[in-house]
Swiss-Prot record:
Amino-acid biosynthesis keyword on record: yes
InterPro entries on file: DHAD_IlvD/Edd, Dihydro-acid_dehy_C, DihydroxyA_deHydtase, DiOHA_6PGluconate_deHydtase_CS, ILV_EDD_C, ILV_EDD_N, IlvD/EDD_N
UniProt source species: Methylibium petroleiphilum (strain ATCC BAA-1232 / LMG 22953 / PM1)
Active-site residues annotated for this sequence: S473
Enzyme nomenclature, EC number: 4.2.1.9
Classification via Pfam families: ILV_EDD_C (PF24877), ILVD_EDD_N (PF00920)
Swiss-Prot/TrEMBL cofactor(s): [2Fe-2S] cluster; Mg(2+)
Keyword Iron: yes
Binding-site positions, Mg(2+): D82, D124, K125, E447
A molecular function GO annotation: 2 iron, 2 sulfur cluster binding
Name of this protein: Dihydroxy-acid dehydratase
Length: 560
């Protein structure tokens, strides 16, 4: 059987002579038309350090594909720097870019009849966007992560991007000198790679390795270290073998493999964004997976890894301690993941992990043994109540007591909330409500790292609650609840909260409640009027018009 199963539709036969002429113009030879055409979706960009080191990996992918007998076809995918856009109008485009990237991959693979695709990505939305595009196209595919960043150093301490956000709060509170503030700003990010903790990019890369769509050890390598280039060439070779075997993403991404990925997210203390993105990934794969499935996995999987933002270590430390294979083998030995899931290697999870010890090495404390976890249960809790009947997501690690009842401080945009924090108008015991920031209302469900970082910097991270229908950065920790659904713009109860109302956040009982009578809530609901759309044309207007609820992934192609 030919391995150019799809591309032969545009390269073979008399009628395709004009097509071949165009290929000849790019240096193709006649023999090349029998080889598979394999796309390389290249996310290289000088917009952000997360993506500024990707070109060498795209080049390595091309070399590996061609050495294995394929034709490599490079095309570009865009990126948004979440870190730079944070706290500005630009953050509204971040989640939008996930859909744009997915559309790019699906469109190029479909339009060019590619036989396979290798996606190279770095910044946060590159990850789910690329995976969604691969699943929609459903040709043999592999994800190559651009690698994590190494830590910065100052006064003997490791630094990362979140160090700078938290320094803003410390400096404005008068708890940090200008010299220290400037040095942290200059030293936090020493080179290329994605933000170094178990933030969104590293969470998603780790999950993709567990899912079976990336090679073992691929998710925690540093961008600036040499092994990542050789690893990319190996990924390209493996992809060509998958093309020969016709092993497709939807053969790999199943309900059981998604459960494996979510188990690893819980075990590593990963980002709240993983909930939103895996709902979207499951939708792209045609797999039934709901927000309640995250809670089901959370209750049985412990947090094993001591990783930032709520722990001590960075992704590169996890890599040196055994990486995701060690985390997975520890979970597999405890019966907490499925060993029979097929992976892009053509082998099962159990086969890939056969040479990995059942327990972590004793000479490290990044990965805990199953008998001595960081926490007995996972950290991403799904809260429900009259404020979030469809669900909301709380990250509960690092908190002495993940519950609070206090007066609401209500803000209809992020900027006014941040200004109130900076002006020291927020007190311990308050519950901040940031609303009209959901998929429809934001639009684009922006992340709230600036306010949460400022709260932590002012020493209020555990004593002030913050709820929002927007999202949080993977670098966020504290008494925070995001993805509140239904969102304010859709008439959710969060739109009805008034200044001073009592609100309860309780991660013990998984409750998020507005402590107001049902009669009063009904009265307010009857008086509520939907706000006018903030945008009436362009990409943000399209997103606001078509995005589903956060509780179903905020996707644009859920038409039922």
């Amino acid at each position: 059987m030919s391995i150019n199963r799809r591309s032969k539709n545009i390269t073979e036969g008399v009628a395709r002579a004009p097509n071949r002429s165009m290929y000849y113009a790019m240096g193709y030879q006649e023999a090349d038309f029998k080889k598979p055409m394999i796309g390389v979706a290249n996310g290289h960009s000088t917009i952000t350090p997360c993506n500024s080191g990707l070109q060498k990996l795209a080049d390595a992918a091309v070399e590996g594909i061609e050495a294995a007998g394929g034709n490599a076809q490079i095309f570009g995918t865009p990126t948004i720097s979440d870190g730079m856009a944070m706290g500005t109008e630009g953050m509204k485009y971040s989640l939008v870019s996930r859909e744009v990237i997915a559309d790019c991959v699906e469109t190029c693979v479909g339009g060019q009849w590619m036989d396979g695709v290798l996606v190279v990505g770095g910044c946060d939305k590159n990850m789910p966007g690329g995976m969604m595009g691969m699943l929609r196209a459903n040709v043999p595919a592999i994800y190559v992560y651009g690698g994590t960043i190494l830590p910065g150093k100052y006064k003997g301490q490791d630094l990362n991007i979140v160090s700078v956000f938290e320094a803003v709060g410390q400096f404005t509170a008068g708890n940090m000198s200008e010299e220290d503030f400037c040095q942290i700003e200059r030293r936090a990010i020493p080179g290329s790679g994605s933000c170094g903790g178990m933030y969104t990019a590293n969470t998603m890369s780790s999950a993709f390795e567990a899912l079976g769509m990336s090679l073992p050890f691929a998710s925690t390598m540093a961008n600036v270290e040499d092994p990542i280039v050789a690893h990319t060439k190996e990924a390209a070779r493996v992809l060509v073998e998958a093309v020969k075997a016709d092993l497709k993403p939807r053969d790999i991404v199943t309900r059981k493999s998604i459960e494996n990925a979510v188990a690893v997210i819980m075990a590593t203390g990963g980002s709240t964004n993983a909930v939103l993105h895996f709902l979207a990934i499951a939708h792209a794969a045609g797999v039934e997976w709901t927000i309640d499935d995250f809670e089901r996995v959370r209750r049985k999987v412990p947090v094993l890894c001591d990783l930032k933002p709520s722990g001590r270590y960075l992704a590169i430390d996890l890599h040196r301690a055994g990486g995701i294979p060690q985390v997975m083998k520890t979970l597999l030995a405890a019966g907490l993941i499925h060993g029979d899931c097929i992976t892009i290697t053509g082998r099962t999870v159990a086969e890939n992990l056969a040479d990995i010890p059942d327990a972590p090495r004793a000479d490290q404390d990044v990965i805990r043994p199953i008998t001595k976890p960081m926490y007995e249960q996972g950290h991403l809790a799904i809260l429900k109540g009259n404020l979030s009947p469809e669900g909301a997501v709380a990250k509960i690690t690092g908190l002495k007591n993940p519950s609070i009842t206090g007066p609401a401080r209500v803000f209809d945009d992020e900027q006014s909330a941040l200004a109130a924090i900076m002006a020291k108008q927020i007190q311990a015991g308050d519950v901040m409500v940031l609303r009209y920031l959901g998929p429809m209302g934001g639009p684009g469900m922006p992340e709230m790292l600036a306010p949460t970082g400022a709260l932590i910097g002012q020493g209020l991270g555990e004593s002030v609650g913050l709820i929002t229908d927007g999202r949080f950065s993977g670098g966020t920790w504290g008494m925070v609840v995001g993805h509140v659904a239904p969102e304010a713009a859709a008439g959710g109860t969060i739109a009805l909260v008034q200044e001073g109302d009592s609100i309860t956040i309780d991660a013990h009982t998984l409750v998020l409640n507005l402590n107001v009578s049902e009669a009063e809530i009904a009265k307010r609901r009857a008086a509520w009027k939907a706000p006018a759309p903030r945008y009436t044309r362009g990409v943000l207007a399209k997103f606001a018009k078509n995005a589903s609820s956060a509780s179903s992934g905020a996707v644009l192609d859920r038409f039922e």
